[in-house]
Amino acid sequence: MYRLLKALSLALALAVLTIFAASCGSNAPAQVRFVHAIQDANPLDIDVSGPNVTSKQEFTDISFLGIQPNQPGYTSMPSGSDTIEGFLTGTTTEVFSDSVSWGSGTQYTVIATGFSLTGANGSNVVLLSIPDNIPTPPTGDVEFRVIHASPSGPGTVDVYIELNPSTGPGLPVTIKGLAYTQASNYVSFAFNPNNDTVPPGYTVYVTASGSTQPPFFISEPIYPANAGAVRTLVLTDVQDGKTMNTSFLELSDPY
């Protein structure tokens, strides 16, 4: 009987420890970076509030295509369900309000896009909360992914990433049929496959889906500094232009 009670006590203690550890793990903060891509909005202050937020978390005075915190970096936010609000900087004028759900210990790129001057109460602002499942590239490689956050661009685009020197996009398509508000998977490329003295970099082409003909929405080089680099390329609008920007916004993804 004594041995049985001892075994039951041990099992109960282990169960309590397991529940406690799971509870602690579930309370680990999320890691968030914020991008202001609302093409018709002035600089923003961002407030995050919710049941797990003890004091309002803020990103402040973010201009169009601004990123906070400085790259590469994230800000710790309580995991779980929260409310995120955008205000014109230094005012109580609300531009948008939306709910988010952030997983424990997960990294996110949060992008506010769409339009602020049409629709009621920020109804035409779109908030993207995209998990950053950042890979460790294979030895000698770099990795890219693309987020389509351009409301004035095509509904879907094809993305070609070509080693320099490049004369234009060629098959196969690197990222095919990327829809507005969606993020691609990461794609791996050899950093310097020909062992050039100066690594050649790449050219990124963004086209309408199914087309390889100019004019391209984007035709821009990118030069990662070293093998092992991981980058997110965000497609956005031109400020007040109602057209896709001819340059992508480059984010550095730490792993």
Where are these regions (language model features)?
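Bacterial N-terminal signal peptides that target proteins for export
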Residues: M1-L10
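Hydrophobic helical h-region of N-terminal Sec-dependent signal peptides
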Residues: L10-T18
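C-terminal motif of bacterial Sec signal peptides marking the signal peptidase cleavage site
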Residues: I19-S23
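Intrinsically disordered, low-complexity polar regions and short flexible loop motifs
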Residues: C24-Y255
